[in-house]
Amino acid sequence: MVYAVVRAGGRQEKVEVGTIVTMDRVKDGENGTIELAAVLLVDGDKITSDAKSLSKVTVTATVLEDLRGPKIVIQKFKNKTGYKKRQGHRQELTRVKIIGIK
């Protein structure tokens, strides 16, 4: 069983071939191919965390779709002054499928 821990959108994700990961928006758009930086590689009993060895490892993923996350609401309120502020935000996300760990 081969799996890797990759840096995806500012976070670390444990992935195997065939895993679908949702991460922050990637510029390549839909149906593009991207490479993710490996932080750790596990191949059976062999664990690789050395940066020199990991520079040779490539984790390839294909972009499935671009989507937006759930809406969150930010509110500010100051007592006795009538000050109210309301703002919403939806994070832009990309869903990718891991197609290879080499």
Swiss-Prot record:
Gene name tied to this protein: rplU
Disulfide bonds: none
Protein name as catalogued: Large ribosomal subunit protein bL21
Positions of transmembrane segments: none
A Pfam family of this chain: Ribosomal_L21p
PANTHER family to which the protein is assigned, alphabetical: 50S RIBOSOMAL PROTEIN L21, LARGE RIBOSOMAL SUBUNIT PROTEIN BL21M
Superkingdom in the source lineage: Bacteria
Entry annotated with the keyword Isomerase: no
Quaternary structure note: Part of the 50S ribosomal subunit. Contacts protein L20.
KW GTP-binding (keyword) present: no
BP-aspect Gene Ontology terms: translation
InterPro entries recorded: bL21-like, bL21-like_sf, Ribosomal_bL21, Ribosomal_bL21_CS
Recorded family membership: Belongs to the bacterial ribosomal protein bL21 family.
Keyword field: Ribonucleoprotein, Ribosomal protein, RNA-binding, rRNA-binding
Gene Ontology CC terms: cytoplasm; ribonucleoprotein complex; ribosome
HAMAP family: Ribosomal_bL21
Function per UniProt: This protein binds to 23S rRNA in the presence of protein L20.
One of the record's GO molecular function terms: structural constituent of ribosome
